[in-house]
A protein has these predicted regions:
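Switch/coupling segment of Walker-type NTPase motor domains
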Residues: 1-113
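Non-catalytic, charge-rich alpha-helical accessory subdomains
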Residues: 106, 110-181
Length: 181
């Protein structure tokens, strides 16, 4: 659109929000507000017209409503969508990225999220569990037979269900990881 500081918020966004907020002709808004000023300056008018304001604050999570994308996973296709979104939004813009590492990360995320979705209790289906699993994936260069807690989880799941979606993804990940050791 235009450069930062050129008046988009003041002359375009805020007038449109205030003009469109009407009880007679209600519309919904999704607004990116990096400075937090738009909500402060337009919230009163929106609330007066019956709007419910929800805020996702990625800087201060204590001031944020919570959103758990795991709650929207219903099948393997949804797992793949979440992984693709996660990868796209955490990519380093200045780096082309090595396709091998990106594919390995995608396989690992797919396996772990698949495990969480199909095997974890509902209250553990979240990014906290994913991070805990990632943090417990210790590798010992001097001991090729060492198995970390995540390896053991997948071994146990494979014993029960050898063709489980998460197991298949984890085996592909381990195969790729083994190709570089």
């Amino acid at each position: 659109m235009t450069l930062s500081g050129s008046g988009k918020t003041r002359f375009v966004l805020k007038p449109n929000i205030l003009q469109c907020c009407s009880k007679k002709y209600p519309v919904s808004f999704v607004v990116t507000d990096p400075k937090g000023s738009i909500v402060n300056e337009s919230a009163h008018a929106l609330v007066e017209n019956g709007y419910e304001i929800r805020i996702i604050n990625t800087i201060n999570f204590h001031k944020s409503m919570h959103y758990n994308p795991f709650a929207y996973i219903h099948d393997e296709k949804d797992i793949l969508k979440l992984v693709t979104t996660l990868m796209a939004n955490t990519k380093d813009e200045g780096n082309g990225g090595n396709p091998f590492w990106e594919k390995s990360a995608k396989l690992l995320y797919t396996a772990l999220i698949g495990y969480i979705h199909y095997e974890a209790p509902m209250e553990e289906q979240n990014f906290t569990t994913l991070l805990e699993m990632l943090n417990s994936m210790e590798v010992r260069e001097d001991d090729e037979t060492f198995k970390n807690p995540v390896d053991l989880l997948f071994d146990e799941l494979e014993q029960k269900e050898p063709d489980h979606f998460a197991v298949r993804q984890y085996k592909k990940y381990k195969l790729a990881a083994g190709a570089i050791s």
